[in-house]
Curated annotation (Swiss-Prot):
Species of origin: Mycobacterium leprae (strain TN)
Job of this protein: Might mediate adherence to host cells by binding sulfated glycoconjugates.
Domain of life: Bacteria
Official protein name in the record: Heparin-binding hemagglutinin homolog
Family: To M.tuberculosis HbhA.
Amino acid sequence: MAENPNVDDLRAPLLAALGAADLALTTVNELVGNMRERAEETRIDTRSRVEESRARVAKLQEVLPEHLSELREKFTADELRKAAEGYLEAATNRYNELVERGEAALERLRSRPVFEDASARAEGYVDQAVELTQEALGTVASQTRAVGGRAAKLVGIELPKKAAAPARKAPAKKAPAKKAPAKKVTQK
């Protein structure tokens, strides 16, 4: 059988193209695997942080009455009120910082198209963490107010009635990041 020189001339470029396609496929598969690992790590990390927050809130609920009884013994009603206001302000400031940080982190995640699924799950976890934090903040505020009221009664001071809480403004939901259109390939 006579060999066709034209087939031999095309063999090397065709094999090179096949090798390049195989390399590209392998690289894409590795990238997808890495992205899946990172998404899973992020999900696990977020879940563990939520669980840690729940544990801290539970511990705070256990320890708070002890701390409040110690404070009741140490402080007068005015000192107790000032301390409670300081704690409430510090907790509110920290909470607001965490909200801002969470929003920034969510925007960074949303800006990466490969993490859209992971960011959607993370957003759910963030919402859960925010709800837990709000519950904890509400519990701390109500218990602090109750202790202040009891301390005032013990001392014989009448506290002003609790003003109606102003309506909280719900944080604006941000639209999901839009995908950039695919680049057009021009032939030369």
